[in-house]
């Protein structure tokens, strides 16, 4: 006799008779509630742009981190549960530093993404009890290594894809279709900044300001834009 749907819902390691892992599917749905993040790859480097939801005028905007540095040549933007993202980013930072220490060279972007997804698939690490649920976060990982610039997208199932452009979060459907229309392989980094921010402006419910968006680039090293640099990109829209 089959278990009820609710019992399949609870078991993170139990497939339903239709071959589905409901907890992973729910985690993927949770990301659609998160703030929108956009990544765009060019020949010069990769641009990341993220919406920051400032829920109260008492909140310090600089404390809301939606783009983080993993290594000097890799950065990542996130949508979903930020605490989960922090766990994954910390793991990736340790992996990249261990690789640099052991081999005397930076870790490739693909290997870093693979290490992140291995952890996502285990739902946690260490000898303590593993997490009882998947990580409720999607990441856009931007990097620059011996293979040139690259952009990867990860989801809670531990799957990753390499992309030229990708949007995640609540406005991802509209943003993805706009990216498809505007992307071409000959974009400059400056054009990519403008496109990413203009698409973000379309899907955001409020006016774009340096306080409610973050922009970063990896070209070839990671750089998070200052509020005045973000203002300069906004003025070009």
Swiss-Prot record:
A matching Pfam family: Proteasome_A_N
Keyword terms of this UniProt record: Cytoplasm, Nucleus, Proteasome
GO terms for biological process, alphabetical: proteasome-mediated ubiquitin-dependent protein catabolic process
Record CDD domains: proteasome_alpha_type_5
Gene3D superfamilies: Glutamine Phosphoribosylpyrophosphate, subunit 1, domain 1
Superkingdom to which the source organism belongs: Eukaryota
Any one of the GO CC terms: nucleus
Compartments (UniProt record): Cytoplasm; Nucleus
Entry keyword Nucleus: yes
Keyword match Transmembrane: no
Biological function: The proteasome is a multicatalytic proteinase complex which is characterized by its ability to cleave peptides with Arg, Phe, Tyr, Leu, and Glu adjacent to the leaving group at neutral or slightly basic pH. The proteasome has an ATP-dependent proteolytic activity.
NCBIfam families, per database record: PRK03996.1
Family: Belongs to the peptidase T1A family.
Subunit structure: The 26S proteasome consists of a 20S proteasome core and two 19S regulatory subunits. The 20S proteasome core is composed of 28 subunits that are arranged in four stacked rings, resulting in a barrel-shaped structure. The two end rings are each formed by seven alpha subunits, and the two central rings are each formed by seven beta subunits. The catalytic chamber with the active sites is on the inside of the barrel.
UniProt-recorded name of the protein: Proteasome subunit alpha type-5
Lineage: Eukaryota, Viridiplantae, Streptophyta, Embryophyta, Tracheophyta
Gene that encodes the chain: PAE1
């Amino acid at each position: 006799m089959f278990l009820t749907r609710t019992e399949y819902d609870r078991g993170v390691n139990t497939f339903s008779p239709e071959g589905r892992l409901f907890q992973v599917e729910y985690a993927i749905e949770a990301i659609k509630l998160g703030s929108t993040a956009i990544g765009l790859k060019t020949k010069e480097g990769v641009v990341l742009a993220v919406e920051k939801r400032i829920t109260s005028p008492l909140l310090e905007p600089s404390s809301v981190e939606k783009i983080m540095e993993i290594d000097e040549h890799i950065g990542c933007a996130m949508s979903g549960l930020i605490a989960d993202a922090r766990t994954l980013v910390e793991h990736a930072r340790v992996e990249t530093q261990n690789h640099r220490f052991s081999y005397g060279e930076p870790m490739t972007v693909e290997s870093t993404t693979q290490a992140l997804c291995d952890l996502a698939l285990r739902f946690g690490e260490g000898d303590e009890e593993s997490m009882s649920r998947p990580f409720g976060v999607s990441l856009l990982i931007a990097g620059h290594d011996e293979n040139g610039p690259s952009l990867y997208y990860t989801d809670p199932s531990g799957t990753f894809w390499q992309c030229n452009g990708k949007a995640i979060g609540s406005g991802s459907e509209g943003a993805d279709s706009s990216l498809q229309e505007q992307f071409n392989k000959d974009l400059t980094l400056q054009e990519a900044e403008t496109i990413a921010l203009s698409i973000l402006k379309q899907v955001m419910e409020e006016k774009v300001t340096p306080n409610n968006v973050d922009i970063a680039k990896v070209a070839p090293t990671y750089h998070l834009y200052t509020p005045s640099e973000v203002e300069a990109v906004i003025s070009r829209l």
